[in-house]
Amino acid sequence: MFRNPIPFKFATFFLSVFIMMGGWAYADDFSESEFFEESNGTEDSPGYSFENEKSFKERNNFFDSNLNDLKITDSRTYTSSPRKRERLRDSQNRLNFDRDYFYGIFSDIAYTATSPLRWDDSDWMTAAWIAGGTSLFFILDEEIRDGFEDNRSSTIDDVSEFFERFGNGAISLPALGAFYLYGYFGENAKAERTALIAVESFLVTGLFTTVLKATAGRHRPSTGDSATSFDGFTTDHGSFPSGHTSTVFAIATVIANEYEDVPYIEPISYGIATMTGLSRINDEKHWASDVFLGAALGYFTSKTLLRLHSDKKGQHFTIYPRVDRNGGGIVLGKRF
């Protein structure tokens, strides 16, 4: 019986805050008409953009006949549309569902698995914090389990059942597949990329989680055994770490990263992942330390894969003409 509520409340609050935070710390062809459009202003200055070179020349004769000299006959500003530039960047970052994608998963697994060989001092410090947090929850595991049991109700069970689904691959993978199709048929490169990286993160994180489960062989809370019951090197018991939590955090991290410009995406993504992790404790499927390590594993695995894909897409250049009352020229943007 859980007698002292202080450790339980502290541990639950700490766990929730951590996983809500998500842990401690090829360009396609664009036609000119697709890239340029008329607008009333840009983030830099008010003005107008142009649809193509012809309309640009016809609008007050900006170019002479041989196109070698640029002359200003209007005080208005002409620039490419920010919205079109964003579309171009998304196209440059496109990830295709092809043979290279599948081959890349295997190389990414090898790179991620050997990441500790390339860690610097800050990485090792982060790993130490995670190990310390896992150890802390390991000490409090049984008290936290008892605290959840004492506060359990049919309403909480219903909420837990709802959020458990987000960590179920039979549901999350088809959902990601549907999101990819939405991006593919809707010509939304960001949606395609997000879905494909999320699927890869799910698979890679799931593999690492399975290896750890088999290595630890920890008994689940539902068995009635103590939190210190580890058989080691067995598939009979797979409590440590939580697979639902690790994979849902892997997906949430990708979505939050790819849609970081949308304010509500990050809190919703990590909020759902947090509730999924807590549902596993409520349902006595996992100890709190299982959930804590699972969240960290999913988060940092996805961060590593996102960096890999960022490197793979290369350093792209965006070039567009710009003319204003002070002169004209070519704007060259480099994406790192």
Predicted regions and their residues:
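Hydrophobic cores of alpha-helical transmembrane segments in multi-pass inner/ER membrane proteins
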Residues: L173-F179
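Alpha-helical transmembrane segments of multi-pass membrane proteins
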Residues: G133-E143
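Perimembrane loop-to-helix junctions flanking transmembrane segments
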Residues: E149-V159
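Bacterial N-terminal signal peptides
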Residues: A11-G22
